[in-house]
A protein has these predicted regions:
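Short hydrophobic alpha-helices and adjacent helix-cap/hinge residues
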Residues: 3-13, 27-330
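Bacterial N-terminal signal peptides
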Residues: 12-24
């Protein structure tokens, strides 16, 4: 059962939008075509895609009406990142929309020298990943989007509130994902400041996640995972190990809390997608992507899963439950 303090607020807001929204914004100029490239299937990225489509629709671009969406999913296969992007370029789509870091990098490379904008989303560190040169002014680059950069130190402080005695914190990530390398660097910085040792385990595919989790058994007091697409895809295997050995598992996105991690300060990835859809609509309407600043997710909230905590052998303090935006109880 999900108990959400802002559920009724969202329902009310949606009702207002449906009544007040002018539906003529995207009607001029005939049918537009966008290519959506998603790096892999997992709930957070699926929610992002749904948010994109909704954000476009609410701004006048309706899939199947005045908008054609070519959706492609590489399912984590790096060999497909570039070929999907190149196919979009060959087909002459109006915009390429990319969900996650590796395929965003491929799309930027494929679209270079063309007039096709690339709008990325769910990318943690777009500057470090080479997708844009900076957050604000990137007029030589026909690229913009929405970052899901989180404050890792907030998650570490949350872990110490729930587990005051934590001394060793494990993390699992794919070293081939630049977003994950960035987050692990931030994790080490945050833990160093609090005297916590970070124990790292790396994976190449989601099939490696269970083995990596097993390698941390007996070595750490808890595990934290960032928004690593490889690990999140194999999350159930990690949760299974953590439940079997009573290793508390913390995450960085709400969908991982829904699936059975304990707590996170995170974005709602549907909202990240919706925010991206609004930007895509603006670019379709004539705004210049190269003059559009990269945005960050607008709302970070605390989500906890009390049942997951019990299965992993700990109890979340009432003070944390009371301030959580969303509490999952099963």
């Amino acid at each position: 059962m999900k108990i959400s303090k802002n559920l009724m607020m969202r329902i009310g807001l949606c009702a207002v939008i449906l009544v007040a929204l002018p539906m003529t914004i995207g009607c001029a100029g005939g049918t537009k075509t966008i290519g959506i490239s998603q790096v892999v299937t997992h709930p957070a990225l699926d929610a992002t895609r749904a948010g994109i489509i909704a954000g476009l629709a609410d701004n006048g671009y309706v899939d199947g009406d005045n908008l054609m969406v070519d959706y492609q999913n590489s399912e984590g296969d790096p060999s497909l990142f570039a070929s999907i992007a190149q196919q979009f370029v060959t087909n002459g789509v109006d915009i390429i929309v990319t969900i996650a870091t590796p395929n965003s990098q491929a799309a930027v490379a494929a679209a270079e020298g063309t007039d096709i904008p690339v709008i990325f989303t769910a990318v943690t560190d777009p500057v470090g990943a080479g997708i844009v040169s900076n957050w604000e002014s990137h007029e030589d680059e026909n690229v913009t989007g929405v970052s899901d950069m989180i404050v890792v130190s907030d998650d570490v402080e949350l872990i110490t509130e729930i587990m005051p005695g934590v001394k060793k914190l494990g993390t699992i990530y794919n070293a081939g994902e630049s977003n994950s390398v960035f987050l692990v660097e931030k994790l080490n910085e945050a833990c160093d400041a609090l005297g916590i040792e970070v124990v790292e385990a790396t994976v190449s595919t989601s099939a490696d996640v269970a083995t990596a989790a097993q390698s941390l058994v007996g070595q750490v007091d808890a595990i934290w995972i960032g928004t690593d697409n490889t690990v999140v895809t194999g999350l159930e295997a990690l949760i299974g190990v953590c439940e079997d050995y009573h290793i508390p598992l913390f995450a960085a996105d709400e969908d991982s809390i829904v699936r059975g991690s304990i707590a996170a300060y995170s974005f709602d990835y549907y909202d990240i997608g919706y925010q991206t859809g609004e930007i895509v609509a603006e670019i379709l309407g004539g705004k210049d992507a190269s003059k559009t600043a990269v945005e960050k997710g607008k709302v970070i909230s605390l989500s906890v899963n009390t049942a997951a905590a019990q299965r992993m052998g700990i109890t979340i303090p009432d003070s944390i439950i009371d301030r959580a935006e969303t509490v999952y109880t099963e």
